């Protein structure tokens, strides 16, 4: 009897805690979604002693989705939700030729753990509309601590229409955030793919990318926050219309003293005008002390390599310098490349040093100089 009472009290307490946390979650969800250009809402649609019925709605300009399900309490909490196939855009899927789109969203917390575990899985589905046929491998979003880490796996896609086709392999994203929120890391892996569309044939090998961002100075009333960022990219082969463009690419770079406004602009990507992004970066370098280090950019093609490295950091009139090196045989079989290299050698922009071609580029407030010769124009 005592154990039963204790268990009942524990379930009741979990329900009370859940109600309080859910209300806070719903408010934060609504506030955050407005900034992102759509509306997210969460509500309880029913309740019992050991459960709560839930609905989470997502509304955008051209779509409406709703996840419904139940949270149950016992030795912790488990919530299971799925897309409502009769609500909003889901009801129209057959009109678009989408078949087999099913998902399950599972959120768990332990009895003595405050870290929620998340798993959202979308099963493989198909799209058949006219002569277009696509097969998607589904996706998985998982996290052992939704506030600090997560993994997204997209299980590839293949499409065909007429004589054209597109195929991508698995894509994996891993994201982690430090407990103090000042450092974040992201890793991505792509298994490669191919496209044969509009007369163009493209094939890519696997590539992987990693980046970090860390707050190095907190925002104050006098100063904006500053960040450091780093990127690493490694890519396999790339073929275009049956011609090997490159066998491998390696890129490593980092930036320091990056102002928050520039971080935000870069995060928005294509949503920000390139002119605005360029102006923000120029101001940060020329007036804010931002630095950019290109540690390595190496392209391998056949037996030849092309590499570049350098730094942008203003020091008086000097802005930065880069060195470019390539093997004489690099790109020798590419139409127009040997002629371009010969012209650069003739005007002194490329010179031979120990069997390799080199160019040293100096950037200053007075302009650009290559191998000591100032360029009239870029």
Predicted segments, located by residue:
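Glycine-rich, small/hydroxylated-residue low-complexity segments
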Residues: 5-378
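Hydrophobic, proline/glycine-rich low-complexity stretches
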Residues: 1-2
């Amino acid at each position: 009897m005592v154990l039963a009472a204790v268990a009942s009290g524990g379930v009741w307490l979990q329900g009370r805690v859940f109600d309080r946390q859910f209300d806070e979650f719903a408010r934060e969800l609504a506030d955050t979604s407005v900034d992102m250009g759509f509306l997210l809402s969460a509500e309880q649609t029913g309740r019992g002693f050991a459960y709560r019925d839930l609905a989470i709605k997502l509304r955008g300009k051209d779509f409406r989705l709703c996840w419904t399900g139940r949270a149950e309490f016992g030795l912790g909490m488990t919530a299971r939700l799925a897309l409502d196939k009769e609500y909003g855009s889901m009801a129209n899927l057959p009109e678009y030729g989408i078949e087999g789109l099913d998902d399950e969203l599972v959120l768990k917390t332990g009895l003595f753990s405050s870290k929620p575990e998340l798993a959202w899985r979308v099963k493989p589905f198909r799209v058949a509309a006219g002569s277009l046929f696509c097969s998607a491998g589904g996706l998985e979003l998982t996290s052992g601590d939704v506030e600090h880490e997560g993994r997204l796996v997209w299980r590839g896609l293949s499409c065909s229409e007429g004589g054209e086709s597109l195929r991508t392999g698995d894509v994996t994203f891993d994201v982690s955030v430090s407990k103090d929120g000042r450092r974040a890391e992201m890793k991505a892996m792509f298994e490669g793919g191919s496209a044969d569309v509009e007369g163009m044939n493209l094939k890519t090998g696997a590539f992987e990318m990693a980046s970090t961002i860390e707050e190095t100075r907190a925002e104050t009333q006098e100063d904006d926050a500053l960040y450091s960022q780093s990127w690493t990219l490694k890519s396999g082969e790339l073929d275009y219309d049956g011609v090997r463009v490159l066998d491998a690419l390696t890129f490593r770079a980092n930036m320091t003293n990056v102002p928050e406004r520039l971080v935000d602009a870069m995060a928005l990507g294509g949503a920000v005008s390139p002119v605005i992004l360029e102006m923000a970066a120029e101001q940060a370098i020329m007036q804010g002390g931002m630095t950019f280090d290109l540690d390595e950019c190496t392209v391998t093609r056949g037996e030849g390599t092309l590499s570049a490295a350098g730094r942008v950091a203003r020091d008086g009139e000097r802005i930065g310098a880069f060195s470019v090196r390539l093997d004489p045989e690099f790109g020798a079989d590419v139409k127009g490349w040997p002629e371009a290299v010969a012209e650069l050698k003739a005007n002194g922009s490329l010179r031979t040093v120990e069997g390799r071609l080199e160019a040293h580029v100096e950037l200053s407030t007075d302009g650009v100089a290559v191998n000591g010769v100032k360029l009239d124009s870029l």
